[in-house]
Amino acid sequence: LVTGEISSDDDNLIINGYSLELINSQEFNKIELLNGAVITTPRTSSPTQSVIELIASEFLIDATSKIDVSGKGLSFDPQNEQYDGASHGGKGGITLWFADNKPAVTHGSITYPSSYGYGAQIPAYGGPTYGGGAIKISAGIFTLEGKIIADGDQPYASNKGGSAAGGTILIDVNKLRSETGNFIISASGGNGVDVAGGGGGGRVAIYYNEFEHIDISRIQTFGGLAGNFDRAGHGEAGTIYL
């Protein structure tokens, strides 16, 4: 899905102020996201679906642009108890409404993740939430001023449901740089509502030879907050591998 116009040829992909949904992996000499550009992916239907990869010698995301695969992961995990947050890199928070509830187990690789976040069940309150999707970036020089996000959904306030887990962000580059240092890389769990738990954090792994102006505190796999702190638990943080 392309909203507006983009510039692409065999060598370069320049997205200027528009949104692009990728259905498969792409390779260019140069990729640039400028002036509010967004790259996303379709929602996955299978935990074994291949991760979409973007490959470029030079890759730039400016301060107004982002790659966003939030909520593009899986629907609810059959292991998940009702009202509990979903698990991925970290365990989802459990509701205290049901004394016997236990969080679903974590899944995926810490060092080279390719797994999707799961969503949580919302029985009697509508459909499930959806976990964060998965994206891989391979580049020679990757300049990141904007955002890469693979967060889990949180339910609408009326749903009273558990939240989804964060997804996966895998970056494999020669040089990762930022002129401003104001970027965000996030694969965090969504926040719960009412008696429900927060989603577990996802997984981020970054392989690099050089860092330039990279503040690692801006790389996040937070667990989601419980809906009501007295009646549910927070999601656990996910994993970050550098």
Residue ranges with predicted function:
Residues 1-17, 22-23:
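Boundary/junction segments of secreted and surface-exposed precursor proteins
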Residues 18-26, 46, 53:
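N-terminal extracellular ligand-recognition/capping segment immediately after the signal peptide
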